[in-house]
Amino acid sequence: MAQMYLAVTIIALLAISHGVSAKRGCSAFGHSCFGGHGKRSGDTSAMDQLSNQDGVLMARHQLGQEETPPHPVYPHSGYNVLASGDDIIPIRDGGVYDREDGGAAREVMKMKLRNIFKHWMDNYRRSQQNPDDGYYIESL
């Protein structure tokens, strides 16, 4: 009996969680989220007043959701969902990282990693050459 109860519980959890997926998240709606912000839902009564004044609800918006326009420099800056195969990833400096042009971005990353590793190795070698200059943690 307990095994059957456990099996039914697992099947119910799988059925409930099957439709819940945050894989594509905001990109499925044509805008970007950079994490940590969540969905912002402000005062919905103000939106209700605006829609009631015009007498028409805005069809594209739902209560509690905001639509952020894409950056004007993006190659596909429409409000619609990007077509499949259009993998455009915004980067922090406001530019766009296109997967087809990944070679240049990889080279920049290699140079940055090389500089970090070189700096670390230089510090390590310097500490090996001058052991009296380093900090020592004495046993308590």
Curated annotation (Swiss-Prot):
| Tissue-level expression | Expressed in corpora cardiaca (CC), corpora allata (CA), antennal lobe (AL) and gnathal ganglion (GNG) (at protein level). Expression detected in few animals (at protein level).
What is the recorded function of this protein according to its Swiss-Prot or TrEMBL entry?
Ligand for the CCHamide-2 receptor CCHa2-R.
Pro-sequence positions in this chain? 41-140
Localized where? Secreted
One GO CC annotation:
extracellular region
Where is the signal peptide, in residue numbers?
A: 1-22
Q: Which organism is it from?
A: Agrotis ipsilon (Black cutworm moth)
Record field: transmembrane:
none
Q: Which BP terms from GO are recorded?
A: neuropeptide signaling pathway
- Superkingdom of the source species: Eukaryota
Identification of the protein by name: Neuropeptide CCHamide-2
Residue numbers of Histidine amide PTMs = H37
Cystine links in this protein are: C26-C33
